[in-house]
């Protein structure tokens, strides 16, 4: 069984037929560098106007090449999983480039019917006080380098990493989840209203 697997990996490396390919354009104001290979994984580093970000991508049989202002992601395997990973890698690279060029922003709204919710940032946490009249404040973690800005009933989560911003926004939404009550009646909470 091991011999077959070895030949399979060898054939991936030596095969010249490309079964799936995606090309991602790199803007002029973004510098993208790549290190590694398909076996050890690729470390992509993007530097742009908003800052710099890195991403580690690894899937054997999926190859990444950078050159001439383009990133080429392709596979020499006819398998569905390899073809699917080409699209996944291309999506991650696009998000990496967009993050350092424009950044990402999630817009959330604080909604309450009776008890006014007080929201404030404290260190790497968002403190939610007086939620449905609770005495104990609820907390939501700010992930990584995401920035949280509170403006009245609006909360903005900004950053260059879409996963950090998305997880921070999700943490805020989950922190105000009401359990064991009718959600049609108790609609207080913090809700994502706009995603990037």
Swiss-Prot record:
Family annotation (InterPro entries): Ribosomal_uL6-like, Ribosomal_uL6-like_a/b-dom_sf, Ribosomal_uL6_a/b-dom, Ribosomal_uL6_arc, Ribosomal_uL6_CS2
Pfam family, any one: Ribosomal_L6
GO terms, biological process: cytoplasmic translation
Recorded GO CC terms: cytosolic large ribosomal subunit
Keyword hit for rRNA-binding: yes
Known partners and oligomeric status: Part of the 50S ribosomal subunit.
Name of protein: Large ribosomal subunit protein uL6
Source organism: Archaeoglobus fulgidus (strain ATCC 49558 / DSM 4304 / JCM 9628 / NBRC 100126 / VC-16)
Underlying gene: rpl6
């Amino acid at each position: 069984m091991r011999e077959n697997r070895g030949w399979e990996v060898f054939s991936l490396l030596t095969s010249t037929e490309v079964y799936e390919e995606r090309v991602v354009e790199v803007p002029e104001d973004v510098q993208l560098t790549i290190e590694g290979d398909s076996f050890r994984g690729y470390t992509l580093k993007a530097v742009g106007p908003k800052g710099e970000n890195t991403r580690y991508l690894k899937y054997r049989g999926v190859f990444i090449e950078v050159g001439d202002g383009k990133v080429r992601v392709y596979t020499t395997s006819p398998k569905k999983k390899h073809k699917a990973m080409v699209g996944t890698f291309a999506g991650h690279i696009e998000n990496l480039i967009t993050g350092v060029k424009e950044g990402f922003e999630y817009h959330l709204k604080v909604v309450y019917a009776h008890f006014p919710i007080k929201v404030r940032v404290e260190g790497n946490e968002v403190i939610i006080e007086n939620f449905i009249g609770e005495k104990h404040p609820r907390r939501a973690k700010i992930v990584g380098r995401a920035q949280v800005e509170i403006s009245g009933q609006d909360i903005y989560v900004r950053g260059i990493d879409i996963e950090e911003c998305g997880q921070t926004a999700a943490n805020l939404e989950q922190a105000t989840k009401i359990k064991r009550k009718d959600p049609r009646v108790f609609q207080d909470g913090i809700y994502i209203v706009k995603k990037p």
